[in-house]
Amino acid sequence: MKKLLAVLVIIGVAAGTAAAGQPPQKQEKQQAQGKVYIPKEVKEPMMAGQAARQARLDIPFSIFKNLFLPAQQAQQAILFFKAKNADLGFAAAVAPQIADATDAAQPKMHARLNLFLQFHTVENGQPVKLIKEIFVPATLEADQAGYDPEAEAWYTIGYPLMPGNYLASLAIASQDLKKIGIQYYELSLPDAKSFTQALDTTPVFFMKGLKQEAAPELTPLLHKGLFAYSVLKITPSIDHVFKVGDALDTFFYIYGVQPKDGGKYDIAIDFEVYEGEKLAIKFAPGAFDNPLVSLPLQLKQTLLIKKGDEERTETRDLPAGDYTFVIKVEDKVSGLKGEKKVPFKVV
């Protein structure tokens, strides 16, 4: 199943794009032709606040992280932001008249917003060249029953960019453009060809959910509680907090590995879990023929139990505590190595 997942993602990346359906070079040409329009009520404050990263909080929100994954020759940049329901303007939806009350659907709350996103290249900490402007109309939905205006949710939007350093300017606006929230976020996307001395990976995350679609998205869309990558809809763990008995469903891509003559890879990976400096779990070494790794790891310890002169082994769930997940990667073709550490918590 996991090998199939890796193949599906690689096919999706090679044959299409992870978000926009066409390479960044073509998108830049369309930008030059003026096919994306940001109204001046939004664009002027976006541009004015870029140099000092001066946020505008008519609609409060915050960009709190980004991920990136390979997309053709580019990198799929994924921005994560969070906002309260009340700040996004949720209101009761007008339901159609239904003759039979038994057919009535659960009443909904809707929020209709316009998102505008700019990417500028960055030199010496300052935005230099506008690479892309994106407009994303969005309608969010929530059940009216149990709706909490103070509840905070997280959202994502992704776009493929060539390697480099960027400033993302994200504006969220009401439909009448009278309320506008603006935030700025700097991100760096690596060049896969630059890893010649050591291996590295994309940011490692742990999956909580996965859904495969029939085709990748042709235009960027706003997603709540998940992100889109090729034909996949992935729900990652945001806080890296797991319950006793949960698995670490890890997902990452390895940079710097070289294929063999037949096109496949020869990658050795050791996975370990540490509690402080103490080794808590050492998983069996893994051999991989693809640089994209998606693998569930059961958080179970094999313990040696001594009672008098008797000894026995017992398998137990990893107990509650703070841990570090360690990934040690070696490319058997080039000899290059790399290591990644990710903190997580079991409760």
Placement of each model-derived feature along the sequence:
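Intrinsically disordered, low-complexity terminal regions enriched in Ser/Thr/Pro/Gly
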Residues: G21-V347
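Positively charged n-region of N-terminal signal peptides that target proteins for export
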Residues: M1-L4
